[in-house]
UniProtKB/Swiss-Prot annotation:
Upper taxonomic lineage: Bacteria, Pseudomonadati, Pseudomonadota, Gammaproteobacteria, Enterobacterales
UniProt record, GO biological process: translation
UniProt-listed CDD domains: KH-II_30S_S3
NCBIfam families assigned: rpsC_bact
Keyword Nucleotide-binding found: no
KH type-2 domain segment(s): 39-107
A Pfam family per the record: Ribosomal_S3_C
Full protein name: Small ribosomal subunit protein uS3
This protein's UniProt keywords: Ribonucleoprotein, Ribosomal protein, RNA-binding, rRNA-binding
Signal peptide: none
Family note: Belongs to the universal ribosomal protein uS3 family.
Length: 235
């Protein structure tokens, strides 16, 4: 199952959170959902050079709060915050409510699946050999602390007549393990031979190790206490 299902969707509510966090009644739900789609589409189009990994949207009390995770915060903010203010006004027009923009810097962009997939796609569009592009990305990710990475490309690779799929993996990528922090993303390279799909899985480590150990330890202590009481009662 873990091999087929979306890695991020399978872990929602366990170790991952939603990208849109708000509540709405039946009347407003579809409008808010469509509004989130339009806001994300606009921001990703405007900030294509800012290396945006993900956009989190919250809706507190008739307003909207947008958090942009980017590897280049200076590109978004601009001189003295001029660019971000213009961006906030445009997002406010799209959403129709007061808007607050937060910028969060990504310290290690080499471990973000979205940025890695976009990087490979851009190299393929520049006619870089796909094996070379994949190895560059994999080596940089493993060097900066990734526990494992898997990259899959599919399409008319290197202009071949018949489309095929090739993948490369280094390290561990445990897709069946819920506590495994796996970042997944998909991108497309539009080449002269057609569209080439790029999928990236990045395993960053296990999140719930300490919590699970604590729970197991407490269970053992409860069993030990129960066995001690039982022995005393027999005596």
């Amino acid at each position: 199952m873990g091999q087929k299902v979306h890695p991020n969707g399978m872990r929602l509510g366990i170790i991952k959170s939603w990208h849109s966090t708000w509540y709405a009644n039946n009347k407003n739900f579809s409008n808010n959902l469509n509004n989130d789609f339009e806001v994300r589409k606009f921001l990703l189009g405007q900030l294509s050079k800012a290396l945006v990994s993900r956009i989190i949207i919250e809706r507190p009390a008739k307003s909207i709060r947008v958090t942009i995770y980017t590897a280049r915060p200076g590109v978004i903010i601009g001189r003295k915050g001029e660019d971000i203010e213009k961006l906030r006004e445009k997002v406010s027009k799209i959403s129709g409510v007061p808007t607050k923009l937060n910028i969060s810097e990504i310290r290690k962009p080499e471990l973000e699946a979205k940025l890695l997939a976009d990087n490979i796609a851009s190299q393929l569009e520049r006619r870089v050999i796909f094996r070379r592009a994949i190895k560059r990305v994999v080596q940089s990710a493993m060097r900066l602390g990734a526990k494992g990475i898997k990259v899959e490309v599919s399409g008319r690779l290197s202009g071949a007549e018949i489309a095929r799929t090739e993948w490369y993996r280094e390290g561990r990528v445990p897709l069946h393990t819920f506590r495994a922090d796996i970042d997944y993303s998909l991108s497309e390279a539009h080449t002269s031979y057609g569209v080439v799909g790029v999928k990236v899985w990045v395993f960053k480590g296990e999140i719930l190790d300490k919590v699970l150990f604590h729970i197991d330890k407490s269970k053992d202590s409860l069993i030990n206490d129960f066995s001690k009481k039982k022995r005393k009662s027999r005596v």
